[in-house]
Amino acid sequence: VLHAPRVQVYSRHPAENGKQNFINCYVSGFHPPQIEVELLKNGKKIDNVEMSDLSFSKDWTFYLLVHAAFTPNDSDEYSCRVSHITLSEPKIVKWDPNK
């Protein structure tokens, strides 16, 4: 059974320009477990990301958290790109600092 991933992008703390924070990409509800998750800054892959261990929920779908340190400002755009067998093309979700 195939399940497409849900993707949520959020900062650990309320965003303040010039103040260091962590950006999180939480990917959940997917199956099979093979997945590629990348954090992007202005469309370019962020290299120094940390990834949680792949875990599964009671319904046997998987979830994963990818995060990186970042310092928000008005000019940079952050997003999360997810590739999975259920997606015809990678899913890109932008971070909204006002959420």
From Swiss-Prot:
- Record-linked InterPro entries: B2Microglobulin, Ig-like_dom, Ig-like_dom_sf, Ig-like_fold, Ig/MHC_CS, Ig_C1-set, MHC/Immunoglobulin
Q: Name one GO biological process term.
A: antigen processing and presentation of peptide antigen via MHC class I
Q: Which PROSITE patterns match?
A: IG_LIKE, IG_MHC
Taking every annotated instance into account, which residue ranges of this chain make up the domain Ig-like C1-type? 5-93
Xref: SUPFAM superfamilies: Immunoglobulin (SSF48726)
User: How far does the signal peptide extend, from start to end residue?
Assistant: none
Pfam families attached to this UniProt entry: C1-set (PF07654)
- Look up the record and report any one GO term of the cellular component aspect: MHC class I protein complex
What is the protein's major site of localization? secreted
Q: Which cysteines are joined by disulfide bonds?
A: C25-C80
> Which CDD domains would you find in this protein's record?
IgC1_beta2m (cd05770)
Q: What keywords does the record list, in alphabetical order?
A: Disulfide bond, Immunity, Immunoglobulin domain, MHC I, Secreted
**Compartments in which it is found:** Secreted
- Presence of the UniProt keyword DNA-binding in the record: no
Record's subunit section: Heterodimer of an alpha chain and a beta chain. Beta-2-microglobulin is the beta-chain of major histocompatibility complex class I molecules.
Function recorded in the entry: Component of the class I major histocompatibility complex (MHC). Involved in the presentation of peptide antigens to the immune system.
Family (UniProt): Belongs to the beta-2-microglobulin family.
Q: What is this protein called?
A: Beta-2-microglobulin
Q: Which organism is it from?
A: Cavia porcellus (Guinea pig)
